[in-house]
Every structure is written in structure tokens, then in C-alpha cells.
Amino acid sequence: MNINVANLLNGNYILLLFVVLSLGLCLGKLRLGPVQLGNSIGVLVVSLLLGQQHFSINTEALSLGFMLFIFCVGVEAGPNFFSIFFRDGKNYFMLALVMVGSAMLLALGLGKFFGWGIGLTAGMLAGSMTSTPVLVGAGDTLRNTASMGSQLGIEQDHLSLGYALTYLVGLVSLIFGARYLPKLQHQDLPTSAQQIARERGLDADSQRKVYLPVIRAYRVGPELVDWAAGKNLRELGIYRQTGCYIERIRRNGILASPDGDAVLQIGDEIALVGYPDSHSRLNSNFRDGKEVFDRDLLDMRIVTEEIVVKNHNAVGKRLSQLKLTDHGCFLNRIVRSQIEMPIDDSVVLNKGDVLQVSGDARRVKSIADRIGFISIHSQVTDLLAFCAFFVIGIMVGLITIQFSNFTFGIGNAAGLLFAGIMLGFLRANHPTFGYIPQGALNMVKEFGLMVFMAGVGLSAGSTINSSLGEVGIQMLASGLIVSLVPVVICFLFGAYVLKMNRALLFGAMMGARTCAPAMDIISDTARSNIPALGYAGTYAIANVLLTLAGSLIVIIWPELPG
């Protein structure tokens, strides 16, 4: 039995697609020194190579892939987008705008200088910024530009070619910039991180172990009563001194939950709740009374829940104002835009932030009702909301706007991005609406992106040889410029205009580039996870701005002088 692989792949689009994805994902696992190629570039390289052999794929698959990807980007950005845009994220918004705006202007200037078309120029911008949202936004706007005519296919091929040529340049140059740029300025990052840690009263260490609180029971002896000196629990402030709080007291056989006015007496049995290291550091006055085993006293269900910040009495407040420990709860982590934040009493809470809180089930439920709601523990996606907002996004994308003789459409990219942001925002406000497990969202977003990359690579592969010799060196040099110059501009703007702390500034710069590998290097250099505060501040807004930049560069290109 003879099998003609070429005919088999050409006759079966689905098989070809998954062969490209499988080979590309394998290639993406390879590392060049400290740099991993990544899934996007792996799939793109394989699809370009197969495209050279005249394999092709249905363009509808390409369209569906980019639609799924950009919609999921909007859903992820939605919970924090408006709070960053309108509230305390002004500096972060301005940094992201400077980064994206300067890169777009440089790309436009270089494209005109070298005489490229819009496809190469937009592709170079996307690759240099290592930003698939730019690629997606530009590709969608190209398809909806009637004036392209017969040039449309060529420009689409050049779009993916420009991206493929400059992606690794953008990634490697940013990683080296993240490693060496902090050393060229006067303030070192560890010192800046420690300064923020001292000002805000948090641990600057980037590694933090999280434990569940445990409960132990002790009998109150004369030493503890003498130490209390007749003060009630409110006056004693036991949590501030020990890291534990008194959950229950048994006195004369009666079990009760104490209020702040209770005074400890000899013979009381108290249940203390705290982290294991807090118990190990307890003052000897507690241990002089014997530890006791009392089934009823120790009968407390410790739970850990993820609470989504929603209510007005929590949004805009500092973490310290929640007084979680006063309510018998322990904060394990804070997540914003899928980025884990340092636990910082000065962090201002945004709508959609997720707090992981441990404590007695009743107390955690009470805290959740006060600040928002407990995130649904479900693996079931609200497909109705997902599909309905997807349809809304496509409908919004059909809207056209006319200025004098100039007409342009909003396009599917902007429409779906808007619809995704709205779905994410509504999800952050209504616990039972539009739920999408993070794993499912990641899978759909990644799959959509890989399908899109496979489509553009197969489409452009047939023209890569003829185009590469003409623009290769120019493209690589331009990619290096567009990758690094905006980073320098952004640093100068943040350091000397906004006067930001350097650790926060470098984190915010990497967030504006949406580059996680570079962010890891910044955290290592700072020996702290404090730069994550800045990274989370710019990440969500940068994803949106990058998508819009991809569309905008195509729209304004014809209006620029040749």
C-alpha cells in the first residue's frame, strides 16, 4: 500500500492543520541558549516551510482562529480594563501608550523610508513587539480594506513574512535589554524593590510559601493572665503580637465565640488559629498553659476560597482597609489580570481582583459577601454567554464609519475585542454570569492563535524566498530599532517625567510589551516579585492598545506621504 503524503495533506485541510500544529509545537519547545522559540514562532516556521511546498488551507480556518484569540484577549482584559483606564492606573496607561505609540510611529517611518508596503511594515511592528494582537488587528483590517484590490493577497503574505523575520529579533533583544538596561541606570533594582517594600510594609522576597492556617487549643495559665494584665482581647491585639487570633473560648464548660470585650481567665481553654510558623513562635506565656485536645473546641472547618472583588465598599480601597485578620481570615495571594501580585497593604484593589483567603468557612463567606463574591468552583463554561457576546462582537465589527470621502470599518478585531472586554467586565460584577474557567479560556485562546499562525504561514510560504532576499537585512535592522528604542523612550518617560520607582517602572515596561520571559528576568534582577505590581498595571491595557495599533497602522498608512 502506497500513501502519497503530499496528496493526502492537500486533500484534507483538517489533517494538514493538525500536522502543522503538532510539528510547530514540537519545534517551539527548542531553546536557543536561554531563549525558548515558543509556540507561535514554532508553528509559523513550520507553516512557512510547508507553504513553500504549495500546501494551503481554507482561509475560513484562519479567520476563526484569529476571532477566537482576540475575543479571549478581551475577556482576560475585561475585569481590570476600566479600573486601569479610569482609576489609579493613569501612569500605567500613559506608559503603555508611550510604548505602543512610539513603536508604531517608528514602524511607519521605517516602512516609508525603505519603501515597503503596509504588509511588511505592520508585520515588522508585530514581530518586533512580539505581539500577536498587532498581527491579528492588522490582518483583519487588511481584509476589510476595499482599496487594496489585487494587492490584498501580497500584503497579507508580507504581513506574516515581516512577523516571522522580526519575532526572534524582538524577543531576544528585549530579553537582553531586560538583563542589561537596569545596570546602565543609576538606581539598582534590588535597592528600588527594597525601598517599596519598606514603604509599604511587605516582604520583598520573590519566593513566598503559602500554608493553610491551623488550629490548636491551649489552657490559660497564670502566666498568660499576668501577661494580659486585665486587658480585653481588643486591647491586647493578640494577632498583631502573635500572628494568631482566638477563634473560640471554653469557660466553665460553655463553648463561645469571644468578642473584643472578653477578658482571659485562669482555666479558660482557647482555640488559636494561625499559620504554622506563627504557632511555633508563640510566646511562652501561651505554652505554659498545657496544650489540650478538645474535639468541640477544635471543630472548625478551615477553607480556602478565591474571592472576586466587586462591591463598591472594597473597590478603590487599600488592602489594609479590609482588615481581614480582624475578621479571622488570612490572605494567601492576590491575582490581577492572571498576574500574582505581592501581598502589599498599600495595594489599591481593582474590580475583578482575585483574593485567595483562608479561614473558618463562615468567616470567609462573611468577608466574601462584604467585598464581592466567591469564585465559582466549576469546570463548566457558560457557552451561551460566550457565543452571544461573540455574535455581538462580529456585529459591532460590521459597523462602518465615514469621514468626508474616507470610509473604514471597525472590523472584527476591534468588535470582538470590545465584546470580550464587556463579557469579562460583566463576569467580574455578576458571579453566575459568563463564567469561563481559566484553563478553558487559555486553551481556546492558544488554539485560536495557533490556527491563525498556521493559516498565515501556509499562505505566505510560497512567496518567502523572493521577498527574503529583497528586505531581509533591512527588516532585521528595523526590527531591532523598533524593539529597543521604544523601551528606552518609555524608561526615560517613566523615570524622569512620571518619576516612578525603578522596580515598578521596569515591571510596567515589560507589561507594556506583554513579554513574560523578560518580566522573569526583571524579577530575578530585582531579587523580588515587586516588579509584578507594575507588570500587572500595564499588561491588560497594553493588549488592547496593541490590537488597536495593528488596525490603526493599516488605516492611516494610505494617508501618509510616500
From Swiss-Prot:
PROSITE patterns: RCK_C (PS51202)
Primary location class: membrane
Record keywords, A-Z: Cell membrane, Membrane, Repeat, Transmembrane, Transmembrane helix, Transport
Annotated Pfam families: Asp-Al_Ex (PF06826), TrkA_C (PF02080)
Residues of the RCK C-terminal domain: 202-288, 292-373
One GO CC term on file: plasma membrane
Gene Ontology MF annotations: monoatomic cation transmembrane transporter activity
Compartments, as annotated in UniProt: Cell membrane
InterPro entries reported for this sequence: AAE_transporter, RCK_C, RCK_C_sf, Transp_YbjL_put, YidE_YbjL
Gene3D superfamilies per UniProt: Regulator of K+ conductance, C-terminal domain
Transmembrane region(s): 8-28, 32-52, 66-86, 93-113, 116-136, 158-178, 383-403, 406-426, 447-467, 478-498, 537-557
Membrane topology, record value: Multi-pass membrane protein
Gene Ontology BP terms: potassium ion transport
NCBIfam families: PRK04972.1 (NF003440), YidE_YbjL_dupl (TIGR01625)
PANTHER family for this protein: K(+)_H(+) ANTIPORTER SUBUNIT KHTT (PTHR30445), TRANSPORT PROTEIN YBJL-RELATED (PTHR30445:SF10)
HAMAP family (alphabetical): YbjL
Entry's family note: Belongs to the AAE transporter (TC 2.A.81) family. YbjL subfamily.
Name of the protein described by the UniProt record: Putative transport protein PC1_1686
Organism: Pectobacterium carotovorum subsp. carotovorum (strain PC1)
Organism taxonomic ancestry: Bacteria, Pseudomonadati, Pseudomonadota, Gammaproteobacteria, Enterobacterales
